[in-house]
Amino acid sequence: MTNATDTNKTLGESMFAQCGYAQDAIDKRVSQVWHEIFEGPNKFYWENDEGLAYVMDTGNNDVRTEGMSYAMMIALQYDRKDVFDKLWGWVMRHMYMKDGHHAHYFAWSVAPDGTPNSNGPAPDGEEYFAMDLFLASRRWGDGEDIYEYSAWGREILRYCVHKGERYDGEPMWNPDNKLIKFIPETEWSDPSYHLPHFYEVFAEEADEEDRPFWHEAAAASRRYLQAACDERTGMNAEYADYDGKPHVDESNHWHFYSDAYRTAANIGLDAAWNGPQEVLCDRVAALQRFFLTHDRTSVYAIDGTAVDEVVLHPVGFLAATAQGALAAVHSAQPDAEHNAREWVRMLWNTPMRTGTRRYYDNFLYAFAMLALSGKYRYE
């Protein structure tokens, strides 16, 4: 059925097991995640008459590169090549832009019938697609045409790096500071887009000439995350300038809010794959400490000041912060290990979300369950 319940060739230790949960119970929870997203009455995965498939953002009633790339990663982790290929086929048919200013990027939002809602890309989709494809090639080998996974992964990254130089358009990474942009046209970032653990794989799989770039990008992102995450609270803004400070404009994305929750999870997975970074481990430990003693339903500025707004994705926030335990447990702060285990226990005791906002929350939940069970693999 699925390979995510196997224990061979995993990240290593399961934090769930370290917290005392039995392996059978862990495996059942991991299997439940697949059922909830892809099969059960609360699923948001759909197959169509073309033999392809998509996942829908149930809160916005559209199909996003974010969600499609997340679903592909989950299909890969569960060894479901059939689902992976149906999703990737839908992406290439309905999201891939063959011409125009953003040629070779993907339209970030599309209606379920394939009608584009936007002609612009969102870089978190492209970086996840590239990673999905490289890992698919490692696991299943390359096929033909769009299923020649590694070739497509290399193509995506080639345009991400070299647009504005050899190709029309703008790159998704600033060529000077090696930091990912919020969108190609902007010169600021989104801290939750920074995936140094992915860039280490890109440095092995991308075009030979670009591999040094990806090594540098991994190091640059780790430095950036240190700057973006507040030393006392561990929080980062949704949008941040290249110095890590919140990006303030009319869009009102300078608080610790929806996108921002993913940062702790990303730091945790990087620690699991590549070893802990002391400062980043301390940042996640600070985040976990703050939210064990403050109202978790409130939105905050990154300095810890409460904002008159309510968290939109409470389950996703909890799951991503719990995944950060993979880093926080390595912090030298005296309460870090205890707090990390408390977050893992809170996640274990929290069900997946139902209702219209379940899409984002349950994706973050799925990634956390895989990572904390030692089953989020990169080989």
Curated annotation (Swiss-Prot):
Its EC number is 3.2.1.156. The keyword Hydrolase applies. It catalyses: Hydrolysis of (1->4)-beta-D-xylose residues from the reducing end of oligosaccharides. Keywords: Carbohydrate metabolism, Glycosidase, Hydrolase, Polysaccharide degradation, Xylan degradation. It comes from the Bacteria. Optimum temperature is 40 degrees Celsius. Stable up to 40 degrees Celsius. Optimum pH is 6.0. Stable between pH 4.0 and 10.0 for 120 minutes. One of its GO terms (biological process) is xylan catabolic process. GO terms for molecular function: oligosaccharide reducing-end xylanase activity. The active site is at residues 66, 259. Hydrolyzes xylooligosaccharides with a degree of polymerization of greater than or equal to 3, releasing xylose from the reducing end. Has low activity on birchwood xylan, oat spelt xylan and arabinoxylan. Belongs to the glycosyl hydrolase 8 (cellulase D) family. This is Reducing end xylose-releasing exo-oligoxylanase. The gene is xylA.
